Design a protein with these regions (language model features):
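N-terminal subdomain of lithium-sensitive/metallo-dependent phosphomonoesterases centered on the IMPase/IPPase/PAP
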Residues: 1-118, 152-153, 180, 200, ...
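Flexible, active-site-adjacent loop/turn segments at secondary-structure boundaries
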Residues: 34, 122-123, 186
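Short, glycine/acidic-rich beta->alpha junctions
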Residues: 43, 126-129, 161
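Short, flexible micro-motifs
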Residues: 65, 123-126, 148
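Short, conserved acidic/polar surface loops in the N-terminal third of protein domains
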Residues: 71-74, 125-127, 157
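Glycine-rich active-site/cofactor-binding loop and its immediate structural neighborhood
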Residues: 112-137
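Acidic beta-strand-loop-alpha-helix segment within the catalytic core
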Residues: 131-215
Length: 215
């Protein structure tokens, strides 16, 4: 848990900094036309590195690889990714960043981690909501789940406070909301509201994912 928390918090701070300083042309369009940004690559590199440093035999199944990043027309993106990662790990080279990204594997064993370095890249690009999602799976069961939301208000009733919160679930021990940069936490539970009229519903912030005629 300590390593996972450290990794996802560090990746969150990385993403917050990148978003604050984000420049035009800081994303690549993949074959499926979905965007991938400096933050996607850097977040994956950071988390894969920290997990593999602590658990060298563990597999990480993640979304990106460095193939697009290494293309001549994307070398500026690679330089930017390396620069931001270098701020966290001084002395880091572009080759090392690519090797950390490529620690991701497409094969799995009884124990493996699964990572989405940025879930909601479009939201990230427009300064809206996105998440960093990490889970540990053993023998087909999720043992640990983490979701960092760097741009989400920790308390919707107090929007003047700084943004960023973290959600942690541990098998057999419950679920918690935590501070992104602190030790404060509160236990989460399923709502006791049974009347759907009184219930709160949530849906994707992306219109294409929230078509009420389909979903």
């Amino acid at each position: 848990v300590i390593t996972a928390l450290q990794a996802i918090r560090l990746a969150s701070r990385f993403c917050q900094k990148v978003r604050k300083e984000l420049a035009e042309g800081a994303s690549i369009q993949k074959i499926d036309r979905s965007p991938v940004t400096i933050a996607d690559y850097g977040s994956q590199a950071i988390i894969c590195k920290l997990i593999k440093d602590t658990f060298p035999d563990d597999i990480v199944v993640a979304e990106e690889d460095s193939a697009e990043l290494k293309k001549p027309n994307h070398l500026n993106i690679l330089r930017q990714v390396t620069g931001y990662v270098h701020d966290l790990f001084p002395g880091t080279s572009s080759d090392e960043v690519c090797s950390w990204i490529d620690l991701s594997s497409h094969s799995i064993k009884n124990r493996f981690w699964t990572l989405d370095p940025i879930d909601g890249t479009k939201g990230f690009l427009r300064g809206d909501q996105y998440a960093i999602a990490l889970a540990l799976i053993e023998n087909g069961l999720i043992q640990l789940g983490l979701m960092a939301c760097p741009n989400l208000y920790a308390d919707k009733d107090r929007p003047d406070e700084k943004r960023g919160c973290l959600f942690l679930a541990l098998r057999g021990k419950g679920s918690f909301q935590m501070e992104l940069d602190g030790e404060g936490r509160q236990t989460l539970s399923v709502s006791k509201v049974s009347d759907p009229v009184k219930a709160s519903f949530t849906e994707s912030v992306e219109p294409d994912h929230a078509d009420h005629l389909i979903h």
